[in-house]
Amino acid sequence: MERLISHPPLMIVSDLDHTMVDHQDHENLSLLRFNSLWEYAYRRDSLLVFSTARSPVLYKELRKEKPLLTPDIIITSIGTEIAFGNSMVPDHAWVESLNSCKWNREIVLEETSKFPELTLQPKTEQRLHKVSFYIDEGKGEALTKELSQLLEKRGLDVKIIYSWGKNVDVIPRGAGKGEALEYLLKKLQAEGIFPVNTLACGDSEHDAELFSIPDVHGVMVSNSQEELLKWRSENALNNLKVIHSTERCADGIIQAIGHFNLGPDLSPRDVSEFLDRKMDNVNPGHEVVRFYLFYERLRRGEIKNYETYIASFKDSCLHAAVLFHPSGAEKSLRDTIDELKKCYGDKRGKKFWVWVDQVLVTDTIPGKWIVKFDKWEQCEDESQCCKTTVEFTSKGGDLVWEKVKQIWSEESKVKDDNSSWIL
């Protein structure tokens, strides 16, 4: 968040499973639409927050399975853990806040052991301020009421969350997705970067707390669970800041951005024109997003008159522009782009997608910029990522590529110098 110098125009706080991530969308099209929009229009000065019931361990597993962007802040384990940045640095003040609650894991484990219908979830899901169980179908509501009374008699003040008809989570009363968001908003206000607008996004009763916070916009995606929609009808039906979208998952989030006029809602993936590249219309971050969309579509064989586009991009490179390939080879950038003609349609019919993450633009001197980002490629089930740096310069009112340097990311599944990685 160090890049922020003023109040972010928008902070999106989104659940992951069945909200940001559509597990029925095997091509991840809605997620990729959101990714392009965020990196193009929002990454520079806004905040992306994921709020999930997953533990940090399961969150990292999801990142390996789906093309998730890197959030600025991650709230995990049903709001009991908060971390910042790519390194997921824990918020120790939040931990101390929960430590001060009437909470004792040993007492929770002692009392829950009296219920044979409860089975502890794997160790990865047992956290400092969360104890999680599976429960026999149909027994959740009665058990949670009885367990709540037992824990209250033992001096604890807890929330017991029954979800999906099979999960029971016990957390401190002061924890939860809503409480974590309220804490986060106060923290941002104290740091002078309180967001102008906040959009909360969810699909299940786990997320209901997010929609109860004053002055926060909310979207319940079209595929939301009946329990959440029932909660809305009883608690938020007349709240004009909370809508039930007509689109699923990430598409519903984009729809809400437009509905509330929170900023641009046209994803670059919905635009087919790549040639409008004057400085008045594009910045270096935009150029990166658009180029790699072009690159993806070219290799998928989806662009008519692709040679015209290749010629245009080639002309946007200095004659001496250079590419430092992750293999260690040094190549002419103009020649590399020209050779893309040979790759047209080589990924046709395959699950081939390209996206960029953490696009950061830095002004060096007037008329020169450095753009750093992660460039990802996925072909079928194989993913590769390079840490990428591009140097741009201004020439005659146009944005010109000067240098591209790529090195393999530690997250990349494939780090050999195979020939499929071009740029």
Swiss-Prot record:
InterPro entries: HAD-like_sf, HAD-SF_hydro_IIB, HAD_sf, NTF2-like_dom_sf, SPP-like_dom, SPP_C, Sucrose_Phosphatase, Sucrose_phosphatase_pln/cyn. Pathway: Glycan biosynthesis; sucrose biosynthesis; sucrose from D-fructose 6-phosphate and UDP-alpha-D-glucose: step 2/2. Its EC number is 3.1.3.24. It catalyses: sucrose 6(F)-phosphate + H2O = sucrose + phosphate. Gene3D superfamilies: 3.10.450.50, 3.90.1070.10, HAD superfamily/HAD-like. Pfam families: S6PP, S6PP_C. GO terms for biological process: sucrose biosynthetic process. Keywords: Hydrolase, Magnesium. GO terms for molecular function: magnesium ion binding; sucrose-phosphate phosphatase activity. Its cofactor is Mg(2+). CDD domains: HAD_SPP. Catalyzes the final step of sucrose synthesis. Homodimer. Belongs to the sucrose phosphatase family. This is Probable sucrose-phosphatase 3b.
